[in-house]
Amino acid sequence: MRKFFGTDGIRGIVNEILTPELAYKLSRAIIGYFKDVKKKKVIIGSDTRNSKDMLKSALIAGFTSGGMDILDVGVVSTPSLSYLVKKYDDVLLGIMISASHNPVEYNGIKIFKSDGFKLEDNVEATIEEYILREDDYFRASPREIGVIYNFTQALEDYKNYLKEIIGEDFRGYKIMLDCAFGSLSEIAPTVFKELGAEVIAYNTNYNGININDNCGAVYPEIGRNLFLKSGAHIGFTYDGDGDRVIAFSEDGEIVDGDVLIGIFAKYLKERGLLRGNKIVGTVMTNLGLEEYLKRLGIGLIRAKVGDRYVLEEILKNNLNLGGETSGHIILFDYMPTGDGLLTSLFLLKILKERGIKLSDLAKEIRIFPQVHEKIHIKDIYITEEDEKEFRGIAEEVINGKNIRYIVRKSGTEPVIRITVEGDVPKEDLTNIALEIKNRIIDFLRRSKRQDLPSKGVS
């Protein structure tokens, strides 16, 4: 089991798990791993958390001590950093300091290669070994120590790239944006305005501690209330680092990632642009989307949860569309990672081209009810045998009913996530999910003897 890297880089509570010492050791370990590579520049960006400067300083100290120059792009979205790393030929890596949708107590470090993709699992594992080894890796001579460059103007390249992809004038559209006090707080309203839309933007005045605080893509019901108040034609709510988005149709309905993928799949197929006639979802992808795709003659490949695993399947099967219920959508012809701003622009492009409302497209996809529960498991190591036991508990509770379930340990938080789904009343699913949750808590209490929350409390 890995000590530092999860499904999306290194992530944890700041100054408990993710410390400046760890950030420094990480950059020194990267110096050791890439010691024979001639490229000597690293792009560093972050979301808006107050811990960004502390972690950035530690990373920069490690990189510059090894002779790496730093291109500091400031506050950026994760997908924009991925784009910039690929665009500039002399850049070795991109470092994104962000914990995505997590609250401000968390932060994370994501590493991108020069092709814009995240590091492979085996490379992360080797770098982790280097961290634990604590060797004093290469140090540059005084004349060769790296320097820091302000590179914030590079965001203009990303902005222009998005506008080039869309190629539309959105005059006449009134757009609501919930920017979650995160990375898209400035650039998202600007891009929509430059394309002619009238923009009503909420949650843009970030202060370092309000990122994702009862706002953004993790809280779509709150975003829906903002949308209804705004009087806009369509709304979008992003997460803290801008790699996911949830939409709101003109009638106030929440349009999640599964529905967005269905809309994009149909649009691309009708134009002969859907590569392989398949798309990639995850184990969480709603059965309603799967049935809709079948009617269109489109296949669905289910990956593990996490946009990196969606991308793996896209690459393995030579496809160009994939995503998650949470709103990570990969439009691979344009971007190798989920991009909330690109996704929202692309959706509006479709609506304008077709002269149609979002509700008209969304209602074609009947999403089955889902219920989610979670169990906090701080400091509890979950084994494969435990996970097998969880599945057995779920199957016993469901008892042959036509209900799909997923029980899994989160790759980004210390929780076990439980999802049940089926074409049955939501109340039935809620009862089943709670029963599974309570039985798993009982099992963990017996087997791990840990102080877990009481029954029914997540």
UniProtKB/Swiss-Prot annotation:
Keywords: Isomerase, Magnesium, Metal-binding, Phosphoprotein. InterPro entries: A-D-PHexomutase_a/b/a-I, A-D-PHexomutase_a/b/a-I/II/III, A-D-PHexomutase_a/b/a-II, A-D-PHexomutase_a/b/a-III, A-D-PHexomutase_C, A-D-PHexomutase_C_sf, A-D-PHexomutase_CS, Alpha-D-phosphohexomutase_SF. Belongs to the phosphohexose mutase family. GO terms for cellular component: cytosol. Pfam families: PGM_PMM_I (PF02878), PGM_PMM_II (PF02879), PGM_PMM_III (PF02880), PGM_PMM_IV (PF00408). This is Phosphoglucosamine mutase. The active site is at S100. It catalyses: alpha-D-glucosamine 1-phosphate = D-glucosamine 6-phosphate. GO terms for molecular function: magnesium ion binding; phosphoglucosamine mutase activity; phosphomannomutase activity. Coiled coil: none annotated. Activated by phosphorylation. It comes from Dictyoglomus thermophilum (strain ATCC 35947 / DSM 3960 / H-6-12). Binds 1 Mg(2+) ion per subunit. The keyword Ligase does not apply. One of its GO terms (biological process) is peptidoglycan biosynthetic process. Mg(2+) binds at S100, D239, D241, D243.
